[in-house]
Regions:
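Terminal helix/beta-alpha structural elements that buttress the NAD(P)+-binding lobe
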Residues: 11-160
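Single conserved hydrophobic/aromatic residue that forms the stacking wall/gate
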Residues: 1-14
Length: 160
């Protein structure tokens, strides 16, 4: 299951990448949709890159003993999570991983990046480059990224 915040057009992109279902979280009740798609069970893991707007609701998508992974905050910082809330929703786990923690040892970083490159090489991860900018337009690239005008991978081309 994948949620897309801006348009049905992104749903086509996500389906090409292997998603079975796409939910527009800003216009659909994504908790109800997740429960529907999972026959009321919920999911094992929620990966949330949005943060403030979706993190608490994401907890309601989880099965008991599920894991909430907040890795971004495009809508703002995630609100504080009360451990009692996690207990009441099924002994849930909550984490906010960062590359600075997981990539501190060279061997771990090489292992993790090697796994990603292997999945890219075997098409288990489908890379879509949807936007490219000249390096001289880096400020426009940042502005477009921050305003959510981009999706997928962005390539910066050296025009110097």
């Amino acid at each position: 299951i994948r949620d897309a915040s801006t348009s049905r057009g992104l749903g086509d992109v996500y389906k090409r990448q292997g998603c079975d279902e796409v939910i527009l979280y800003k216009s659909e009740n994504f908790v109800e949709k997740v429960k529907y798609f999972t026959n009321g069970e919920g999911v094992d893991v929620v990966y949330d890159g949005v943060g403030k707007d979706t993190a608490i609701l994401g907890l309601d998508c989880l099965k008991p003993l599920g894991t909430m992974v907040v890795f971004g905050n495009s809508s703002g910082n995630c609100p504080p999570i009360d451990p009692g809330l996690l207990a009441s929703k099924g002994s849930l786990f909550f984490t906010r991983p960062t590359l600075m923690t997981y990539g501190t040892k060279e061997k771990d970083l090489l292992h993790s990046s090697g796994r990603v490159f292997e999945m890219l090489a075997t098409n288990k991860i489908k890379l879509e480059i949807n936007t490219s900018y000249n390096l001289s337009d880096v400020s426009k690239a940042h502005a477009d990224l921050e305003s959510r005008k981009t999706f997928g991978s962005i390539v910066m081309k050296n025009d110097y």
